[in-house]
Design a protein with these regions (language model features):
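Glycine-rich portal/gate segments that line the openings of hydrophobic small-molecule binding cavities
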Residues: 53, 65-113, 176
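A short, structured loop/turn motif at beta-sheet edges
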Residues: 38-43, 72-73, 99-106, 128-137, ...
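Soluble non-cytosolic domains of exported or imported proteins
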Residues: 35-42, 88-89, 119, 153-164
Length: 176
């Protein structure tokens, strides 16, 4: 019985995305997460473009990830529609803009996510896909630099946690 519990624990731990703050200074930081999914690079690429199906609702402005879209082409928008409040107009947020779209290999966005937009920060958000035994290895990286009130190093662990959570959402969605 103990052998089976240990095996289950090891499987659970290995299934979680490996995340880490790689570097952190008052003027910037780099975070990276990795996960292997049981999907082809083509299937993984397509799911990146269906971001509203796997991004966490709690990390949106509208409260619904279904309001998000990500166009998988250079110049494409990583945007969120904001529903109208009462009789007022609807709104929108550009979370990022696609800089590089290399199908099945790499997607890079200029994306000062969330609270970084109101700081003097630049953010590069990328996913690299590599065929691996039984699926695809995804490396998700976010690099930010510039001025942040109180220091960017204070933001690094928060961004790392939030983005690792999104990679887990992508992994879960691809497992269906």
């Amino acid at each position: 019985m103990r052998k089976y519990l240990l095996s289950a624990l090891l499987l659970t731990l290995s299934a979680q995305a490996a995340a880490a703050v790689e570097e952190s200074t008052p003027s910037g930081f780099s975070v990276r997460s990795r996960a292997t999914v049981a999907a082809t690079p083509a299937e993984t690429w397509a799911m990146l473009g269906r971001i509203g199906e796997w991004w966490n609702d709690e990390h949106t402005y509208s409260g619904k990830a279904a309001n998000m879209r990500l166009e998988l082409k250079a110049g494409g928008c990583f945007c969120e529609a904001l529903p109208a409040r009462s009789a007022g107009p609807s709104g929108s947020i550009e979370h990022g803009r696609v800089l590089t779209a290399m199908p099945y290999d790499m997607l890079v966005l200029d994306a000062p996510l969330g609270p970084l937009q109101s700081q003097a920060m630049v953010g590069r958000f990328s996913w690299t896909l590599r065929a691996a035994a039984g699926g695809t290895e995804i490396t998700q990286t976010f690099v930010a630099g510039g001025y942040a009130r109180g220091g960017a190093d204070k933001l690094a662990p928060i961004v790392d946690k939030v983005l690792a959570e999104q990679l887990e959402g992508l992994k879960r969605r691809l497992a269906r």
